[in-house]
A protein has these predicted regions:
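Short amphipathic alpha-helix adjacent to the substrate-entry channel of hydrolases
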Residues: 94-113, 117-118
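The feature captures the conserved acid-bearing segment of alpha/beta-hydrolase catalytic domains
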Residues: 199-218
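Short beta-strand element of the alpha/beta-hydrolase
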Residues: 79-88
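N-terminal twin-arginine translocation
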Residues: 18-26, 33-47
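Gly/Ser-rich "nucleophile elbow"/oxyanion-hole loop immediately N-terminal to the catalytic nucleophile
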Residues: 126-168
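N-terminal cap/lid segment of alpha/beta-hydrolase-fold proteins
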Residues: 44-75
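Gly/Ala-rich beta-loop-alpha elbow adjacent to hydrolase catalytic centers
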Residues: 169-173, 177
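N-terminal secretory signal peptides
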Residues: 1-19
Length: 218
């Protein structure tokens, strides 16, 4: 793994602080920039209030399995546009939940399903390499697409407008954003640094570059 990416990913692991991130910035951009950025990096994570929202864990069945998700939506409203929120390799942690709350405060029903639960708990790993090889690499794209379909159906039954569905995802979830934009009833997608290419396999038969021609959503 690239040394800079390794430092950055290591800093994102549960229990790691901003010191590792500052170290990575120093490696890449020089100590001067890192010193200037340190006060910003040291700030606490954003915590969006739940005032006026209904927020928390929900579940739905997909192919005989129970899938759990975090959802947030404006309280007492229906006909809401839906946003699927897809995490990076670390699963549905507090930042992902907060993204849902931010979207809900803006008038959306946001739902972030736990797409790794059948294979294990990403938060139980302390090393990125082990997390990737022992858990992430074992998650089939077909399973992920089905779970996202289930999340959409749940949203439609709980105040969401299925004519207004969007998806956003981070890193691993960015790749999934591209794939689901070609698979599901999506009007728009926003992929944050998602992987576009890769080796085809039984679990990951296609990558975003392979389905680019059939993407219809912006």
């Amino acid at each position: 793994m690239d040394q800079y990416l390794h430092h950055d990913l290591h800093a994102l692991l549960p229990g790691r602080g901003v010191a590792s991130r500052r170290h990575a910035l120093g490696l890449v951009l020089g100590a001067g920039y890192a010193a200037a950025a340190a006060p910003v990096l040291a700030q606490q994570a954003i915590a969006t209030p739940v005032d006026g929202l209904v927020a928390g864990e929900v579940s739905f069945a997909v192919n005989g399995a129970q899938v759990y998700a975090y959802r947030a939506a404006p309280q007492g409203r229906t006909g809401l546009p839906v946003v699927l929120v897809v995490s990076e390799i670390f699963g549905v942690h507090e930042h992902i939940a907060d993204v849902c709350r931010r979207l809900a405060q803006a008038g959306y029903l946001a739902i972030a399903p736990d797409l790794f639960a059948r294979q294990g708990d990403p938060m139980a790993y302390g090393e990125v390499a082990k997390l990737m090889s022992e858990l992430i690499a074992k998650v089939p794209d077909a399973q992920v697409m089905a779970d996202l379909d289930g999340a959409v159906q749940w949203a439609g039954a709980h105040g969401g407008d299925l004519n207004k569905v969007a998806i956003t995802g981070f890193c691993w979830g960015g790749r999934i954003t591209w794939l689901y934009a070609a698979h599901g009833p999506v009007k728009a997608g926003v992929a944050w640094y998602g992987r576009l290419v890769g080796q085809a396999s039984a679990l990951n038969p296609k990558h975003p570059v392979d389905i680019a021609a059939i993407l219809k959503a912006p």
